[in-house]
Structures are given as structure tokens and as C-alpha cells.
Amino acid sequence: MQGSAIFSGVFELREGVCEEEFLPTLKAFYEHFIEVGFASGYRILRREALEGFGKTLPAFKYRGALIYPNMEREQAAYEYVKQDGEPVRSLHHAMNSKVKRGADFFVETCIVCNRSSS
């Protein structure tokens, strides 16, 4: 949807943490943002090697994308997390404790969107 905002994080899991252990914590974190009315959806993606490409990208295996209807909702969600209150504090800690240091984040806005690509 044009005008939507997507907050993405690229990261790797800590040593000894498996995907099956991690995914429920990220899902719970993302679903909380939907339940309280900030976000409209999410995607959790695993990076696949593409021979000959991606050499200039930072090292990451996963990308989590939290989808907002607009930048105002994304910014409100960011402020909500900064308040460090419950339950988002515990949900964030449960998820973040399984991720290696060095995760990186960015926000995008959709300028042209095709419904079939959602």
C-alpha cells in the first residue's frame, strides 16, 4: 500500500540459538504491535545466498520487517518502545537476547506498491 512504512532489522542469531527457538519470540514481539494498533503486518525472512551478489551487504542471515500503515504509526511505535514499559520491554528482551550484537535497522516508505507483491 502506497505510503506504508516498513521497519526492518537485519541480524544473525547468537551461537547456540536455533531458528525454532527464536521465531516464537520475534512473532510475539511483532504481534504485540499489531494487537495494540501500531502495525498492520510483518514478514520474517531468511537470506539465501545468491552467487556473485551481495558482497557489499553487511553480514546477516535474517530480516524482520514490521509493516505500518504510515510513517506516523511507525514513529508512534518507536516512541512506545523507547518508553521501555511492559509488556513491550519483556517481549523485546526475550527476542533480542537471542540475536547477535551488531544487528542493524532501517525504515522504508512505499512509493509504488503492487498488491500482488504483499
Regions found by a protein language model. Name each.
Residues 48-50:
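A cross-kingdom feature marking solvent-exposed beta-strand/loop segments within repeated
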Residues 32-40, 54-108, 113:
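An amphipathic, aromatic/His-enriched active-site/gating alpha helix that lines ligand/cofactor pockets
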Residues 23-27:
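Short amphipathic alpha-helical segment that frequently serves as the phosphate-/nucleotide-binding helix
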Residues 1-5, 55-58:
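Short, flexible turn/loop "capping" segments at secondary-structure junctions
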Residues 13-22:
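Short, surface-exposed ligand-recognition loops at beta-strand->loop->(often short) alpha-helix junctions
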Residues 4-12, 63:
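Active-site-flanking beta-strand signature of metal-NTP-handling nucleotidyl enzymes
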